[in-house]
């Protein structure tokens, strides 16, 4: 997955990969933006001891939701995407079951997770994508942009851990919780091979 995005940036560069809405503004996110964000966030994960970690991501549509997904699995970690419409107690239960140690979330989740810090002692980092109005007083909150700044600084010193990390195609890289319509929700474990096969099939369809 990491190599696919690196080669896409080399081929498509400053072409727009995503248009997304930021309040009333429509912004562009290029292939180079995506790869740079992946490298910066992934390097910060290494620096913070979060490579190989299980990281939840929850919220509305945003390019950083996707870069979180791809960065985490590129460091040897496991991504745990959660529906932002879930009941907060169910969300906490899923993060506990998936053994998450960090959670990345968009502005719609501000306050909902940090207000339940006492129920999330296993979460070392709460990482808001849009930090405006978020409560940073708990000591475990660090904004997404601060992660990117930290990763960028490490890259400027020659840190290559993110791109050098070797990935086994058969390693688990994602846990997807089922809807639980016929019983309790189950965590489906997917490998890098599963994801790349799905991407390849989608391209061929």
Sequence positions of predicted segments:
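Hydrophobic alpha-helical segments in the ANL/AMP-binding
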Residues: 6, 46, 63-82, 91-92, ...
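Conserved AMP-binding A3 loop
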Residues: 28-32, 165-166, 173-200
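Structural core segment of the AMP-binding/adenylate-forming
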Residues: 74-150
């Amino acid at each position: 997955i990491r190599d696919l995005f690196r080669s896409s940036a080399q081929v498509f560069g400053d072409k727009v990969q995503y248009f997304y809405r930021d309040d009333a503004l429509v912004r562009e996110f290029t292939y180079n933006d995506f790869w740079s964000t992946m490298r910066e966030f992934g390097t910060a994960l290494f620096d913070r001891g979060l490579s190989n970690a299980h990281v939840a991501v929850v919220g509305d549509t945003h390019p950083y939701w996707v870069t979180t997904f791809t960065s985490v699995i590129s460091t040897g970690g496991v991504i745990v995407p959660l529906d932002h419409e879930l009941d907060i107690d169910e969300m906490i239960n899923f993060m506990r079951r998936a053994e998450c140690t960090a959670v990345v979330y968009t502005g719609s989740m501000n306050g909902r997770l940090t207000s339940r810090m006492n129920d999330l002692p296993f979460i070392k980092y709460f990482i808001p994508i849009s930090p405006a109005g978020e409560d940073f007083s708990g000591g475990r909150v660090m904004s997404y942009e601060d992660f990117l700044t930290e990763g960028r600084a490490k890259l400027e010193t020659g840190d290559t851990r993110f791109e050098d990390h070797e990935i086994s195609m058969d390693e688990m890289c994602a846990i997807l919780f089922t809807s639980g319509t016929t019983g309790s929700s189950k965590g489906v474990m997917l490998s890098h091979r599963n994801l790349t096969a799905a991407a390849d099939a989608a391209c061929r369809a």
